[in-house]
Every structure is written in C-alpha cells, then in structure tokens.
Amino acid sequence: MSKIVKVLGREIIDSRGNPTVEAEVHLEGGFVGMAAAPSGASTGSREALELRDGDKSRFLGKGVLKALAAVNGPIADALVGKDAKDQATIDQIMIDLDGTENKSNFGANAILAVSLANAKAAAAAKGMPLYEHIAELNGTPGVFSMPLPMMNIINGGEHADNNVDIQEFMIQPVGAKTLKEAVRMGAEVFHNLAKVLKSKGYNTAVGDEGGFAPNLKSNAEALEVIAEAVAAAGYKLGTDITLAMDCAASEFYDAEKKEYNLKGEGRIFTSNGFSDFLEELTEKFPIVSIEDGLDESDWEGFAYQTEKLGKKIQIVGDDLFVTNTKILKRGIDNGIANSILIKFNQIGSLTETLAAIKMAKDAGYTAVISHRSGETEDATIADLAVGTAAGQIKTGSMSRSDRVAKYNQLIRIEEALGSRAPFNGLKEVKGQA
C-alpha cells in the first residue's frame, strides 16, 4: 500500500512573497503527502543550490518553474512504482538523477519538497504521525523529546531593515516544565518587549521571523531591552529565561581586510577581537548559545572561539557546517564548535538531514533544528525535532503564522505524546547540563 503512483509539484508563495516549490506524493490506497521547501536570506556559500529561474519578467527572477519541471518530469518518472517507506532509496534516486554535488541540476528546493512529501505519505500509509515515522527512519523508534525553543524576538542583519548588525537575539524559556508553558512564557515576554520598545520611542514593526526590528543604539541594547521585557513579564533572567544569539557574522565580515564591521555601532574587530567582544556580552548577560559567531571560512578564528567559550556555552555552526556531514566531520575532527544548526534545505533531503543529526549526536555535539527566514505553513521541522529527540528548535518569534504554525504543531504533538516526550529545558543546551 506504500507504492508511489503519482508525484507532482506546484509553485506556491512563501512568507516573503517569493515563490517556492510544493510537492505532493500520492500512494496506492489514496495516501498523500504534501510538503514545501523553505528559503534562506543569509545563506552559507556551501549550501545545496536553491534553483531559481532568473527570468526577470516573472517574480523578479525568483520563479521556480525549472525546479518544478524536475519534479513533474524526471523525478516523477523515476519514483512512480517505488516504495515510499524506503526513504533512503527515494532520496538516493533523486540525488543520483541530479548528478551534482550541490543539487544544482534539479535544485535542492525540488528534491527536498519531494523528499519531505514522500515521508509524509509513507507515515500516512503506516497509519502513524510523521514524528513517529521519522523516529523509525532515524533508527530510534519510540524515542521522543520536546525541544527547547530559541525564540527570535529581536531581528537584525539580513532579516530586518534596521541598523542592528547581529541577526537574531533569542530567548529560551528554560524555566518551563512543558513545551506549552515555554510557548506561553515566550509570548508573555514578546508582548512585554513591545511595551518596552514603545516606551523608548522605538518602532515595533516585525522582521522576517516575527521578531521586532527597531533601530537601536548598539547590539548590547538589544539584550538590555530584552532583559527589561523579561523582568516586566515577571520572570527572572538567567533562571526562567536564558538568551541566545545568531550573529550571522559572514554578513558583516570583510574578507579582504579580515575584519568584522559592526556598522550599526561603528566598531571594527579582528577575528579574535570579535570573539573577545562576544565573551564580554556573555559575562554581562546570561547568553548560553551563540551561532555563527564568525565568518563561515574563519576556521582558525572558530578554533579560538571554541577554546575560549566552548566549555561555558553552546557554539553553533550554521553557515559554518550547512547541515553537511563532510564539513561537520572536519569540524568534529578539529574541535570546532560544539553544536550544529540543522536546516533541511541546506543539504536538500531528509535522509542526509538525519545523517547530519546522527553524526553530531555521536560526537557529543548538540543539534538545533531550524526554520529559514522564508517559510510557509509547512510545519515538518516540528515533527523532525520531536522524532529525532534533537532537544532544541529555532522557529522564530510569537508573530507571523508561518512561525506560529510550528509552535502550534509542537503543542499538538506534546498533547498526543504526553510523558513519552519529556521537555528537558536547559539540559539540552551544550555546556549547561
């Protein structure tokens, strides 16, 4: 009953008003899976390729008709008749057909949408929720946990039209006992942050990921206003709520001068100097996780940063590792960072995503499941986080339904699993157990 009878793709719109690929996989017995590919703004140079048409007369060149042609043509032809339950084979067929290292022939957006739709169809055929099917594919059947959210409540960098250089300032509701309580705490801090910003005369428009995007005097001020909001919500910073940052430092790195330029506050740093600056912030605020704290190619600098901060906090590689096992292995072998950010579309298939999570966990690294800044209502990452017991998730703030869809799916899953999916809070963060 899990034989594929039809594969089709369509062009839909993401949260930034750009087209993306949505795929459907139909099986015998009437089972259907549907999934959409997300899209990033600050992308790592080694990510799998997102195929765009480049035809300026349609969607300003961002159309995905070429990727759709791959889904509806060679991919569909190759997958019809195959068993959807054999995810690794389905993914390998598409990877081999594409024939490139970075999926540039069909596009990672085409392959990923079909890969995820296939997993959903197989779960339906097995009569089980997606998270349960993912746990089986992961070789960890019946092992679940609810992830600690990193909620991006102030947006800067490439995710906002403001003067804040650091891309994400996040809160983690570590004092919560359940995912549902964590969501409530996050929402309360978010609403109090709006009041704090308004009281200071700051704008409360939101960025791509639903966080506020004000012009601030400095990056440190972002942490200061969040601290005020936490207190106003009746919570204790460092006990109930901890902080995390995504610097996305590649976006303000000058490769020629080998300098990190925080234009918003008029400061320029060397590689080690920027790591020292981050260390100062961790001494002033309870920051327990820093992502992409240096440029993706600054491996020497990351070695220094990991040595300096890695015993105390979580050092997450996003653009650094791009969910790629070959690059992650190099990081593990050289003691670079201690955590990986997991984004489906950086690598382009579910099977390869699961391999990256496994490699990280086997090496004692944590894995943080993540959305992209361009999202849809597709909430597959919620099931991925629970089904792999990853322990942490980044899926934006408490506004924009493209973000909230993931939190709502997590609430539903927690309700269904009950005590089978513990919420471990701060213990999930590297260096905090």
From Swiss-Prot:
Its EC number is 4.2.1.11. It comes from the Bacteria. Pathway: Carbohydrate degradation; glycolysis; pyruvate from D-glyceraldehyde 3-phosphate: step 4/5. Binds a second Mg(2+) ion via substrate during catalysis. Its cofactor is Mg(2+). It catalyses: (2R)-2-phosphoglycerate = phosphoenolpyruvate + H2O. (2R)-2-phosphoglycerate binds at Q167, K343, R372, S373, K394. Keywords: Cytoplasm, Glycolysis, Lyase, Magnesium, Metal-binding, Secreted. GO terms for molecular function: magnesium ion binding; phosphopyruvate hydratase activity. Its main location: cytoplasm. Pfam families: Enolase_C, Enolase_N. It is an enzyme of class 4 (lyase). InterPro entries: Enolase, Enolase-like_C_sf, Enolase-like_N, Enolase_C, Enolase_CS, Enolase_N. GO terms for biological process: glycolytic process. The active site is at E209, K343. It is found in: Cytoplasm; Secreted; Cell surface. The keyword Secreted applies. Mg(2+) binds at D246, E291, D318. The keyword Oxidoreductase does not apply. One of its GO terms (cellular component) is extracellular region. Catalyzes the reversible conversion of 2-phosphoglycerate (2-PG) into phosphoenolpyruvate (PEP). It is essential for the degradation of carbohydrates via glycolysis. PANTHER family: ENOLASE. Component of the RNA degradosome, a multiprotein complex involved in RNA processing and mRNA degradation. This is Enolase. It comes from Vibrio cholerae serotype O1 (strain ATCC 39315 / El Tor Inaba N16961).
